[in-house]
Amino acid sequence: MNLRPFCLLLGFVLLGTNPVLAGYTYKEDDTRLVNGVLYDINGDPVTGTYEVFYENNIRKSLMPYVNGILNGVGSLYNEKGVKEADMPFVDGKAEGIALVYYEDGRLKEKIPYRNGKINGVMRTFFENGNVKERISYDADVRSGPAKSYYEDGSLKEVYAYADGKKEGAATVYFYDGSVAEELRYSGDIIVGERNVYYKSGNLKSRILYEFGRKNGNMQNYYEDGKLAAVIPYKDDKIEGEGAFYKEDGTLDLTVNYKDSIRDGAAKAYYPDGKVKLAANYQNDLKNGTETEYFESGAVKTEMPYVDGIVNGVGREYYETSGLKMEMTYVDAVANGTAKFYDQDGKLSAEANYKDGKKDGTQKDYDKNGRLVAESNYVKDVLDGEYKEFYEDGKVKSTASYANGILEGLTLVYDTAGNLSYEIPYVNNRKEGKVKRYYPGGELMGEVTYEKGKKHGMLDAYNKDGTLMAKVLFNKDEAIKGYSLNHGKDPVLMSEEELKLINEAY
């Protein structure tokens, strides 16, 4: 260190007529250490205090010397200048209790020294003052009983050392004092059976260790004592088929492992033991076809996996018949054409998907394969023209959707292709004049809708355009109506006639 020499005269003792320095504070550059004896620049053994500083001139240590030998209590400091430890020395060797501190000055460790080595019980402390750990030492080597504690002071663990290594039985405790674990050490490694417990005292897991490594079947238990899992270990890694059970004791899962990751067959089960789901793993990722089953054993779904992601054509089946649906997936998202089938195996619908949502044309078919409806979707929502068809392919109706809502004019046709109705929609409700036509195109009748309900006068016409009837509506209810003979001779309608008129519009 490049430090300026600095001496502080603490006092002196006169021996005869020669003044001899009895106490100084020495800097590092003022001294030299030879065979364990500290000498000053004049070659005299140091008696006084010896200081060492960090490069920023913050004190690093302050050590007491008598005749060049450490004697008394020395102190160590961190780079902030805060004391870290007090070390007692006798004749150049640590002797007594060394104290180590937290930065705020609270006690962190008490270390017993004898003849320069740790001897006795070393204690470490939490910042709240409670003991954290007690470890027995013999000539710097851990030997004998040891204990660790929770921050509230309750016992956490009891174990022992021999020749510096953990040896023999060890017990770990919960905060409340109940046993959490029981295990054994040999030469600092776990050997034999290791048992883990619930707070109730019931066994939670059991595993055998060989040379510090898990070997054999680890058995996990529910708190009521029922088996939860059997997991095979070899050289500290899961190897082979693990089995996992439900709380009622029935088998839930079996999974094959290699080097502690899933590799090979994995299955889920119904309560009666039949396979519910079967998949295959490679390097912890699903690969190949994942098959789901009904309880009857029939295939329910088939999903293709590549490196843990669904890619390809997925299929869903009816329990008692055949294919129900086919869907193409790209990176676990539906993309492309999806096909849907009825229980007779006939195509019932096909739709296009993009980014997991319906997007584009959907077509619906009857049992004979004839087109019955055609619609358009944008991001899973009806949007655009919607058409229905008769069996012969003629248009039955047309409608318009905007963001899933009926908007605009819906047209309905008869089997001959003639316009039968014009129905205006606003925000999914009939709004405006609904018109009905004869097959020849003549107006048969018209009525006004307000907020989805018939309101006002309905006029019905003969083919020649003369009035056939007039009916007054109020909020979808026919109040009164008259039949007319080509616009003449009104006759009050019966309740039954009003009902028929209401149904027709």
Pin down the residues of each PLM region.
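Bacterial N-terminal signal peptides that target proteins for export
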Residues: M1-C7
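Bacterial N-terminal signal peptides
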Residues: C7-T17
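Glycine/tyrosine- and acidic-biased, solvent-exposed loop/turn segments at the edges of beta-strands
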Residues: N18-Y505
